[in-house]
From Swiss-Prot:
Cellular localization per UniProt: Plastid, Chloroplast; Mitochondrion
Name under which the protein is recorded: Valine--tRNA ligase, chloroplastic/mitochondrial 2
A GO molecular-function descriptor: valine-tRNA ligase activity
Reaction catalyzed: tRNA(Val) + L-valine + ATP = L-valyl-tRNA(Val) + AMP + diphosphate
PANTHER family cross-referenced by the UniProt entry: VALINE--TRNA LIGASE, CHLOROPLASTIC_MITOCHONDRIAL 2 (PTHR11946:SF93), VALYL-TRNA SYNTHETASES (PTHR11946)
Motif, 'HIGH' region: chain positions: 109-119
Sequence ranges of the LRR repeats: 432-454, 857-880
Keyword Hydrolase carried by entry: no
GO cellular component: chloroplast; chloroplast stroma; mitochondrion
Protein family (similarity comment): Belongs to the class-I aminoacyl-tRNA synthetase family.
Length: 974
């Protein structure tokens, strides 16, 4: 029966094998003839005689190789294929077929970056999306670019200058910035070229850099607009401060590590009382910044002290209030908390809530300032040791006990980050966050996987104002100017240029004013938050690209920057363009090592993508990465890469077989007949022999399933389903079955059908796999005859093509019969080269279609073609045969004497049975020992019991086989 699905997806262009006029099939075309089996040596001979080479579209440029001439796919050809794609303009959006554009802004890697597995992950996933949509006829734009990476780039250049004995401050700002630009021009393209190695089919003609003139204009425009709305302000607030870099850093640039340390117990005298309150702290050096002691309001131990004051040690009698607040954890330390709001994020928030003063005791280089008295000028960690010694000397040190610390360290350099109150520029986030929350709530924005919506909502609901200023020289200079002589926090000018700022200053203060620009630059994430629309021409809303491609369709990135980048892009997109910048967000996880550990240099488990490409090929790496699940971490191992390299080789070898099997190009008549077979038409499908009908039907089912998975972004399902179909159905079954038709004596008609099916199925497999494995599939595609276009732009297979469910069931019966015979051969150790006889028994209906595939069955099962018999009743020598049940209504009998030397087999199985029995007895003895059962780990005992059960089943089956052999021996002797 023929089934057609109602599944609806974007309709691709008609394929090469699907002309507008349907072919009327000649009913005599598929006449069946008896054919003989061909030996492997004969097949090789035929292969050699029928070899031919097809000219590829770019063969003149030596771009492509062919399985006809190359034993394996040559990884070195990947670069040539990539350059050819790019030279043909395939990466640019093509509006010829109409349709709505598919647009992805590439997450811009740092210009200082070197390719790592995180890059490989996002490039693979985004390229899959882009290639799939391109093949579906949509104009695709994958817009690439790099980030200026303020801190990282400045550090790289400073290090380079240091090797020359030059300091940044000696050069001055302008000269240093010039040197950074020179470095960028020389080395900035490294990461771009490495991304190309991964096969990224992005439009490099539109490549952007966050410090490009146009993007810089967008940054200034955004700052001015936000300031004009009162959303940007300047103030002194708590930030993450890098003492070495002398700048504020973002939360993402702070990594917390669990490290051994101490919890210091220190006594504070209660003023006007002989009593002391003992606090516990991990940072005694900050006590100079204490502004209060806090206890829990329900802690009866300290309730009588609330409202009194305490004297801070080593501060010459400075008093601080003793307060009560539920923020205090009664069970931590002593239950008394010192409040140092100038040097602790939580203390800072509590002080702001309660109106406590903020006292800073640190200089920007992490030495203590004059508030610390005698400790002024000493490093914070040196003060910790000296202060504790002094406290011990005066009797205020109670004890210090080992304690695991959660230490904030800089992502760059590893220094300990200092919470510090500093004058910075901030964005007021609450009004922006409200709109971003509504975007998800109103389904304007879909986050994949859905579970990350909760994290997104939590972050935006509890959002803090964003510190956007950095004390660096490399980056977008903050568009704020000050008037010389009027330096105060409130007296500044925001303008789009120095000329505009001077004009405003003259207007405000009259003649003879001198202005200077704020020395700080903007946080790199500020320019990145504008990326989806600044790269398309904004703030010029009339720009062609902005109108054609904004808003974009998809933002794909790691789940770790959902807040730092994705949420900020959503907020800025809504604020400046009135719409979400992308309709979908696809989040991937981390790539870990084979043991599930995060890759790090310290562990020595970092896998280099470029080394991986060299050893396994880009396609194997991409396929391995793509088999993951959205939002989940992926464990990467050489075993997986090796397996998928083998998959690449299997594809190549299948291509070699298909090419060998096709008619010679000089045989134009054969090619006309072959191309005239429209295998996506129902009438053609119904006329195919069973194996061919099965293969095409299974392919059509696969196309629907895989296309649906592509649409749902279930890439792991796409990879697994296509892999299984290619390897199990096509390579293991259909290619093997086709050999009985291609190289036998049955004439050209059935051979032509098999050739057409081989080509049709293989070319569609290449299409389905191309987004995952672009290089090997394009190379194989170009080797196939009559290719009118490159695979990268060939139409996606059509959906809802016919399939014959009955043929699938029938071929599955043939497979079951083949497996049963193969298993019997293995069980009785029949030599692979030996052809055996068989009697196939089944109903008249089953025998009718199975017998038509006698040659296929004989080839796949290694049967003697002249001694394969079909009947609806068991043979006369059934009691001397191995009885196989393949499926309901389909059985087989294999004459035992023709298969093996029965007496030798009896001896062999008897030895095996004896060995099994010995193993079984030993296990039973262990289980009979109370000492073992009572003292051995539970899982060990359970494992032994499972071995016993397994052996019992094996012994039972082996005894049955031995009894059968012995009974056969006695019957034969009679």
């Amino acid at each position: 029966m023929i089934l057609k699905t109602a599944f609806s997806l974007p309709t691709p262009t008609t394929t090469l094998l699907s002309p507008s006029s349907p072919h009327q099939l000649n009913t005599l075309f598929f006449t069946r003839r008896r054919r003989r089996l061909i030996s492997p040596s004969r097949l090789n001979s035929i292969f050699s005689q029928r070899r031919f080479s097809f000219s590829a579209a770019a063969s003149g440029n030596n771009v492509f190789t062919s399985p006809e001439t190359s034993k394996t796919f040559d990884f070195s050809s990947e670069e040539k294929i990539y350059k050819w794609w790019e030279s043909q303009g395939y990466f640019k959006p093509n509006f010829d077929q109409g349709g709505s554009p598919f647009v992805i802004p590439m997450p811009p890697p740092n210009v200082t970056g070197s390719l790592h597995m995180g890059h490989a992950m996002f490039v693979t996933l985004e390229d899959i999306m882009v290639r799939y949509n391109r093949m579906n006829g949509r104009p695709t734009l994958w817009l690439p670019g790099t980030d200026h990476a303020g801190i990282a780039t400045q550090l790289v250049v400073e290090k380079m200058l240091a090797s020359e004995g030059i300091k940044r401050v000696d050069l001055g700002r302008d000269e240093f910035t010039k040197r950074v630009w020179e470095w960028k021009e020389k080395y900035g393209g490294t990461i771009t070229n490495q991304i190309k190695r991964l096969g990224a089919s992005c439009d490099w003609s539109r490549e952007r850099f966050t410090l490009d003139e146009q993007l810089s204009r967008a940054v200034v425009e955004a700052f001015v607009k936000l300031h004009d709305k009162g959303l940007i302000y300047q103030g002194s607030y708590m930030v993450n401060w890098s003492p070495n870099l002398q700048t504020a850093v973002s939360d993402l640039e702070v990594e917390y590590s669990e490290e051994p340390g101490f919890l210091y117990h220190i006594k504070y005298r209660v003023a006007g009382s002989p009593d002391f309150l003992t606090i516990a702290t991990t940072r005694p050096e900050t006590l100079f910044g204490d502004v209060a002691l806090a206890v829990h309001p329900e802690d009866d131990r300290y309730s009588k002290y609330v409202g009194q004051t305490a004297i801070v040690p080593m501060t010459y009698g400075r008093h601080v209030p003793i307060i009560a607040d539920k923020y205090v954890d009664k069970d931590f330390g002593t239950g008394v908390l010192k409040i140092s709001p100038g040097h602790d994020h939580n203390d800072y928030l509590l002080a702001r809530k309660l109106g406590l003063p903020i006292l800073n005791v640190m200089n920007k280089d992490a030495t203590l300032n004059d508030v610390a008295g005698l400790f002024c000028g000493l490093d914070r960690f040196e003060v910790r040791e000296k202060l504790w010694a002094d406290l011990e000397e005066i009797g205020l040190a109670v004890k210090k006990e080992p304690h695991t610390l959660r230490v904030p360290r800089s992502q760059r350099g590893g220094e300990v980050i200092e919470p510090l109150v500093s004058k910075q520029w901030f964005v007021h986030m609450d009004p922006l966050a409200e709109k971003a929350l509504l975007a998800v709530e109103n389904k304007e924005l879909t986050i994949i996987p859905e579970r990350f919506e909760k994290i997104y909502n939590h972050w935006l609901t509890n959002i803090k104002d964003w510190c956007i200023s950095r004390q660096l020289w490399w980056g977008h200079r903050i568009p704020v100017w000050y008037v010389v002589g009027k330096d105060c926090e409130e007296d500044y000018i925001v303008a789009k240029s120095a000329e505009e700022a001077l004009e405003k200053a003259l207007e405000k203060y009259g003649k003879d004013v001198e202005i200077y620009q704020d020395p700080d630059v903007l946080d790199t994430w500020f320019s990145s938050s504008l990326w989806p629309f600044s790269t398309l021409g904004w703030p010029d809303v009339a720009a062609k690209d902005f109108n054609n491609f904004y808003p974009t369709n998809m933002l794909e990135t790691g789940h770790d920057i959902l807040f730092f980048w994705v949420a900020r892009m959503v907020m800025m997109g809504i604020e400046f363009t009135g719409t979400v910048p992308f309709s979908h967000v696809y989040l991937h996880g981390l790539i870990r090592d084979s043991q599930g550990r995060k890759m790090s240099k310290s562990l020595g488990n970092v896998i280099d993508p470029l080394d991986t490409i060299k050893d396994f090929g880009t396609d194997a790496l991409r396929f391995t990465i793509a088999l993951g699940t959205a939002g989940q971490d992926l464990n990467l191992s050489t075993e997986r890469l090796t397996a998928n390299k083998a998959f690449t080789n299997k594809l190549w070898n299948a291509g070699k077989f298909v090419l060998h099997s096709l008619p010679s190009l000089s045989d134009t008549s054969a090619w006309e007949n072959l191309l005239d077979l429209k295998l996506d038409k129902e009438e053609t499908l119904l006329s195919l022999p069973l194996p061919e009908c099965w293969a095409v039907s299974k392919l059509h089912i696969l196309i629907d399933s895989v296309t649906a998975s592509y649409e749902k972004l279930f890439f792991g399902d796409v990879g697994r389903e296509t892999y299984d179909f290619f390897w199990s159905d096509f390579a293991d079954w259909y290619i093997e079955a086709s050999k009985s038709r291609l190289y036998g004596s049955g004439g050209n008609s059935v051979s032509l059908a098999s050739q057409a099916v081989l080509l049709y199925v293989f070319e569609n497999i290449l299409k389905l796999l191309h987004p995952f494995m672009p290089f090997v599939t394009e190379d194989l595609w170009q080797a196939l005859p009559y290719r009118k276009e490159a695979l990268i732009v060939s139409p996606w297979p059509q959906n809802s093509l016919p399939r014959n469910v009955e043929s699938i069931k029938r071929f599955e019966n043939l497979q079951a019969l083949t497996r049963a015979i193969r298993n019997a051969r293995a069980e009785y150790s029949v030599e692979p080269v030996k052809r055996i006889s068989a009697s196939v028994v089944g109903s008249a209906e089953v025998i009718e279609y199975i017998s038509k595939e006698k040659e296929v069955l004989a080839l796949l099962s290694r049967l003697d073609l002249n001694n394969v018999h079909f009947s609806n009743a068991p043979p006369g020598d059934a009691n001397l045969s191995v009885h196989l049940v393949a499926s309901e209504g389909l059985e087989a009998y294999l004459p035992l004497a023709a298969m093996v030397d029965i007496s030798s087999e009896v001896q062999r199985i008897s030895k095996r049975l004896s060995k099994m029995q010995t193993e079984y007895d030993a296990l039973i003895t262990r289980l009979s020992s109370p000492k073992f059962v009572e003292k051995a780990p539970e899982e060990v005992v359970r494992g032994v019991k499972e071995q016993v059960e397994e052996l019992e089943e094996k012994i039972k089956l082996t005894k049955a086989r031995l009894d059968f052999l012995k009974s056969t021996t006695s019957l034969v002797s009679q």
